[in-house]
From Swiss-Prot:
InterPro entries on file: GTP-CH-I_C/QueF (IPR043133), GTP-CH-I_N (IPR043134), GTP_CycHdrlase_I (IPR001474), GTP_CycHdrlase_I_CS (IPR018234), GTP_CycHdrlase_I_dom (IPR020602)
Name by which UniProt lists this protein: GTP cyclohydrolase 1
GO terms, biological process: one-carbon metabolic process; tetrahydrobiopterin biosynthetic process; tetrahydrofolate biosynthetic process
PROSITE patterns in the record: GTP_CYCLOHYDROL_1_1
Top-rank taxon: Bacteria
Keywords carried by this UniProt record: GTP-binding, Hydrolase, Metal-binding, Nucleotide-binding, One-carbon metabolism, Zinc
The reaction(s) this protein catalyses: GTP + H2O = 7,8-dihydroneopterin 3'-triphosphate + formate + H(+)
GO MF: GTP binding; GTP cyclohydrolase I activity; zinc ion binding
Pfam families associated with the record: GTP_cyclohydroI
Oligomeric form and interacting partners: Toroid-shaped homodecamer, composed of two pentamers of five dimers.
Residues that bind Zn(2+): 86, 89, 158
Enzyme Commission number(s) from the entry: 3.5.4.16
CC annotations in GO: cytoplasm
Amino acid sequence: MAIDVKAIEEHIRGILIALGDNPEREGLKNTPKRVAKMYEEVFKGMCYSNDEIAEMFNVTFEDDLCINDNENDMVFMKEIEIFSHCEHHLALMYNMKVAIAYIPKKKIIGLSKIARIADMVGRRLQLQERIGSDIAEILQKVTDSEDVAVIIEGEHGCMTTRGIKKPGTKTITTTLRGKFNTDPIVSNKLMMLYTK
């Protein structure tokens, strides 16, 4: 699905009029075009399904990997910074830090691909909970591992700049699949690494 930049421009112009401003005045003349271009960039992830993102980043390494299926060795990355926009208010979700872990089976994925998956999933109208489950689903598809964990901490503009107006409020969500959800030793190891 392609983003309709022209339609966004027209609607932003309409919003400016509805707000009581003049879209032809100097400071706003190019605003609809700039906003449409920005939306095309920040919502790029909406152009792709989880399957398409998995295919896009499906570069794995298998030849040099010696894995014992009984092991609980994990790959763990944290402090992956992303942003997103909440689907309820279109408000920015910011200061988002993502931690991702998986237990390799037969394939490992390049570290930069993990960060790129998180970034692409964030570039949608989202819920923080869904960002975690989307990342987990994609990583499961790419690595063929059921054992995936995603922890996200972030701030939400809909909490900090409107309504209750509580700046600094952080939301933490967890998505735990496979052993991360069923094996206390694995989940404890995850939390130890996360809080380190």
